[in-house]
Amino acid sequence: MTRIGTPLSPTATRVLLCGCGELGKEVVIELQRLGVEVIAVDRYANAPAMQVAHRSHVINMLDGAALRAVIEAEKPHFIVPEIEAIATATLVELEAEGFTVIPTARATSLTMNREGIRRLAAEELDLPTSPYHFADTFEDYSRAVQDLGFPCVVKPVMSSSGKGQSLLRSVDDVQKAWDYAQEGGRAGKGRVIIEGFIDFDYEITLLTVRHVGGTTFCAPVGHRQEKGDYQESWQPQAMSPKALAESERVAKAVTEALGGRGLFGVELFIKGDQVWFSEVSPRPHDTGLVTLISQDLSQFALHARAILGLPIPLIRQFGPSASAVILVEGTSTQTAFANLGAALSEPDTALRLFGKPEVNGQRRMGVALARDESIEAARAKATRAAQAVVVEL
């Protein structure tokens, strides 16, 4: 039976969030609504989730000793990683010592590294994936490209949000794709995965929640990416009943193998009735921001319920819905957003401005959300709302 105490008192139920981006911010808001005391931790001050947490700490998240010191001082009931770049070996140790990591320390560890999760899916679970090779050197990488042929995709084994990812179409792309992958990895230069290109019809994120009552799926989320970065998403993505059933089978197999409780974003490629596993995040997914307008329980509310052991009897989907990101390019520590009245002038629209303290280059600073009679209309409406926002640097 779940029991939640009073925040900032001896009875408090404490959650420590590792990583404080826009997804973490929404998770904190949902936990706050349930009376949970939230401690936010990230590598820079005033990160979005810190702005809505009870208190925060700034540390190098890859420094195991620093992470351990904060966790031992705060004594959280739940440790919730929101990003991949964390000292996962320390989380494994802390879990063995009695701390609860969401969903599990093993899941966090395996999914931090594309190699761990790909080998689990393809070799242990025998799920359909693209053909692949791993390489540590340019020579091994070149051989892998030759073996798989063009087009193929290269990614650092440790990166997030599409960083370092390239589609190779010819020999001319081989060197520059290698260089870009080496720049984009989270741990600097290193190992890459080379994947044979799947000529898919579309890709989806199947938001899958493991909770006290079992496993529940949200309606499939379709999305469009550029250079591996999400630009827009929509729900529900139209699929054949056979493809949807196979997607749920694959998502259940992967999330069951990872274990624990929480929401997972399972990325899949679809062609006709065929389904291939791509990746999984053991936490809310950026493409799932659409659920802030498309469902009665957003992916963040679902994650909060699952973490706390609360039931999820039903997820109500409100019909064709879409999200479009607000990308900002430039350098500023005092970004402002104008023309918001125009952005919100149509019915069934919403905005989320993330409150990121700075932009240096290109950064996702907000998202526009919309519902309409069809997916096409919802996408167009969300894009209009996003484009109406005037950014002042």
Swiss-Prot record:
Q: State if Iron is listed as a keyword.
A: no
Which Gene3D superfamilies does the record match to this protein? Answer: 3.40.50.20, ATP-grasp fold, A domain (3.30.1490.20), ATP-grasp fold, B domain (3.30.470.20)
Q: Which Pfam families match?
A: ATP-grasp, PurT_C, RS_preATP-grasp-like
Q: Write down the EC number.
A: 6.3.1.21
Descriptive protein name: Formate-dependent phosphoribosylglycinamide formyltransferase
Reaction(s) catalysed by this chain, per the record, are: N(1)-(5-phospho-beta-D-ribosyl)glycinamide + formate + ATP = N(2)-formyl-N(1)-(5-phospho-beta-D-ribosyl)glycinamide + ADP + phosphate + H(+)
Q: Which residues bind ATP?
A: R114, K155, S160, S161, G162, K163, G164, Q165, E195, G196, F197, I198, E203
Q: What does this protein do?
A: Involved in the de novo purine biosynthesis. Catalyzes the transfer of formate to 5-phospho-ribosyl-glycinamide (GAR), producing 5-phospho-ribosyl-N-formylglycinamide (FGAR). Formate is provided by PurU via hydrolysis of 10-formyl-tetrahydrofolate.
Fetch the InterPro entries from UniProt.
Answer: ATP-grasp, ATP-grasp_carboxylate-amine, ATP_grasp_subdomain_1, PreATP-grasp_dom_sf, PurT, PurT/PurK_preATP-grasp, PurT_C
UniProt gene name: purT
Q: How does it assemble?
A: Homodimer.
Gene Ontology biological-process entries: 'de novo' IMP biosynthetic process
Family membership, please give it. Belongs to the PurK/PurT family.
SUPFAM superfamilies from the UniProt entry = Glutathione synthetase ATP-binding domain-like (SSF56059), PreATP-grasp domain (SSF52440)
Name all ATP-grasp domain ranges. Answer: 119-308
Q: GO: which molecular function terms? A: ATP binding; magnesium ion binding; phosphoribosylglycinamide formyltransferase 2 activity; phosphoribosylglycinamide formyltransferase activity
Looking up HAMAP family in the UniProt record yields:
PurT
Please, which domain of life does this record's source organism belong to?
Answer: Bacteria
Q: What class of enzyme is it?
A: ligase
**Metabolic or biological pathway, per its Swiss-Prot or TrEMBL entry:** Purine metabolism; IMP biosynthesis via de novo pathway; N(2)-formyl-N(1)-(5-phospho-D-ribosyl)glycinamide from N(1)-(5-phospho-D-ribosyl)glycinamide (formate route): step 1/1
GO CC terms, sorted: cytosol
> Which residues are recorded as binding Mg(2+)?
E267, E279
Binding locations of N(1)-(5-phospho-beta-D-ribosyl)glycinamide: E22, L23, E82, D286, K356, R363, R364
Q: Which cysteines share a disulfide bond?
A: none
The record's NCBIfam families line, in alphabetical order, gives: PRK09288.1, purT
Q: Which UniProt keywords apply?
A: ATP-binding, Ligase, Magnesium, Metal-binding, Nucleotide-binding, Purine biosynthesis
